[in-house]
């Protein structure tokens, strides 16, 4: 099936955040080690409040949202022209009666996905960037799974860009800072072709001697 990698990445980050919240006392020291910020106490208090919601979505929101927020977007995807699976016929599926099947195909893509961490100050952004990096690394195996649980993302590499201003659509929002993580990965995508043309129940009638 055609995978939606941005949705799978967002779901994986959200799952890791849920795991972090359930074991924050254990995981926070391990993830952050000695890294602290001027707003560390306020940040930890925020996470300790179960009613506070972490927004993880696909694309940038167009309205103000309470912090923190993580926005996942597909930056680029390119079919690998020398990959093994380009337009290959991976099998013939024949459901039901003979002659009613459809062909299955697969291709390999190289994708680049942006994960933006937004916050009201640099401390919040740094905190969310470290937590999101941990989330992506801890969910790496799950993202390799086939849809709908994962997105068949292989050879994942993670990098971080510098602090950046928010996009134009966020100009009036409460987020003056953003830190972008970039996830690059190979992705295997599969799909089914059209049902093959078939002829069923055809009959031919021959009248001997006609026209002689």
Segments (PLM) and residue ranges:
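Small/polar-rich, solvent-exposed N-terminal microdomains that initiate assembly or binding
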Residues: 1-93, 196-200, 205-212
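Acidic, Ser/Thr- and Gly-enriched intrinsically disordered low-complexity segments
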Residues: 7, 62-69, 73, 77, ...
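A generic structural micro-feature
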Residues: 64, 105-107, 171-177
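Extracytoplasmic
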Residues: 67-69, 110, 178
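A contiguous catalytic/ligand-binding core that recognizes phosphate-bearing ligands
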Residues: 91-95, 99, 116
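Short beta-strand/turn micro-motifs at beta-sheet edges
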Residues: 96-105, 170
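Glycine-rich, often proline-containing surface loops adjacent to acidic residues and nearby aromatics
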Residues: 105-119
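Acidic-leaning, charged glycine-interspersed low-complexity segments
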Residues: 123-192
């Amino acid at each position: 099936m055609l995978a939606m990698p941005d949705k799978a990445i967002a779901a994986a980050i959200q799952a890791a955040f849920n795991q972090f919240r359930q074991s924050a006392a254990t995981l926070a020291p391990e993830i952050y080690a000695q890294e602290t910020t001027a707003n560390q106490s306020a940040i930890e208090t925020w996470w300790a409040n179960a009613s506070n919601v972490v927004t993880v979505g696909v694309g940038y929101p167009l309205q103000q949202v309470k912090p923190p927020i993580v926005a996942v977007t597909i930056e680029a995807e390119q079919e690998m022209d020398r990959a093994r699976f380009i337009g290959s016929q991976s099998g013939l599926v024949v459901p039901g009666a003979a002659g009613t099947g459809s062909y299955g195909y697969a291709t390999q893509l190289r994708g680049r996905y942006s994960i933006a961490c937004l916050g009201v100050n640099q401390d919040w952004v740094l905190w969310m960037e470290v937590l999101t990096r941990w989330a992506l690394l801890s969910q790496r195996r799950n993202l390799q799974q086939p849809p709908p649980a994962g997105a068949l993302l292989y050879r994942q590499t993670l990098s971080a860009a510098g602090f950046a201003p928010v996009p134009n659509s966020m100009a009036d929002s409460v987020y003056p800072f953003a830190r972008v993580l970039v996830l690059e990965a190979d992705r295997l995508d599969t799909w089914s072709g059209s049902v093959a043309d078939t002829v069923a129940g055809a009959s031919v009638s021959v009248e001997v001697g006609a026209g002689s």
